[in-house]
């Protein structure tokens, strides 16, 4: 597990978060792939896969920017009831839940797995938070996470199989027929390191970037 947290150690809840940059990394076969609490993280070109509970957790607020990541949870060794992606914006101080602002941007990412719902949020004050999912391929149960009526989900591909080459063998390259190919937004490639994928291949290879960490060659 990559764990990053800064809550209550100095007696202040939700003060200026600490910075962590994760790029071109593969995280797999953990209980939780990425666990962040009141932190500041940028994550580019990462593959988080096959975790016993959560793929990525962003809790107790914080500032997070995720671009060109593949979060794919096909854990098969026991039953999993938790989603691949979870976020919340509060901490309990022993008396009540205290809101900590959550700012999260998810661009050109896959969030998928073998559960019906792979994105969940538990927000104390959603109007005080900012979050967006742009040009992402996601798996959700509308009864749990009604993305169709949440403006923060922009140009998302819902419940379309990303068609990985062989996720059972951790091969998360896209098949030729994947809906994620050329489905990203090139305007979201805002830093030079996004011009190549996790394997160092040029991005984009086609008319637009693929939605994922691995660009289809």
List each model region and its residues.
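Glycine-rich, flexible loop segments associated with nucleotide phosphate handling
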Residues: 13-22, 98-105, 130, 195-197
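C-terminal accessory segments
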Residues: 155-216
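Short, charged low-complexity intrinsically disordered segments located at boundaries
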Residues: 15-16, 20-21, 54, 97, ...
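Intrinsically disordered, glycine/charged-rich C-terminal tails and inter-domain linkers
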Residues: 21, 65-66, 71, 91, ...
């Amino acid at each position: 597990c990559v764990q990053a947290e800064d809550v209550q150690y100095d007696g202040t809840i939700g003060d200026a978060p600490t910075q962590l940059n994760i790029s071109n990394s593969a995280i797999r076969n953990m209980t939780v792939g990425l666990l962040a609490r009141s932190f500041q993280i940028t994550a580019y070109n990462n593959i988080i896969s096959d975790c016993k509970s959560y793929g990525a957790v962003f809790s107790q607020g914080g500032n997070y920017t995720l671009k060109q990541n593949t979060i794919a949870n096909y854990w098969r060794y026991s039953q999993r009831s938790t989603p691949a992606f979870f976020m919340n914006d509060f901490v309990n101080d022993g008396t009540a839940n205290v809101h900590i602002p959550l700012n999260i941007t998810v661009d050109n990412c896959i969030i998928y797995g073998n559960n019906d719902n792979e994105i969940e949020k538990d927000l104390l004050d959603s109007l005080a938070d900012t979050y967006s999912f742009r040009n992402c391929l996601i798996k959700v149960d509308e009864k749990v996470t009604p993305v169709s009526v949440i403006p923060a989900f922009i140009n998302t591909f819902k419940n379309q199989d990303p068609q990985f080459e062989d996720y059972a063998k951790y091969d998360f390259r896209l098949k030729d027929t994947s809906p994620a190919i050329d489905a990203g937004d090139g305007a979201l490639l805002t830093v030079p390191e996004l011009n190549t994928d996790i394997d160092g291949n040029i991005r984009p290879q086609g008319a637009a970037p693929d939605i994922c960490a691995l660009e289809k060659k």
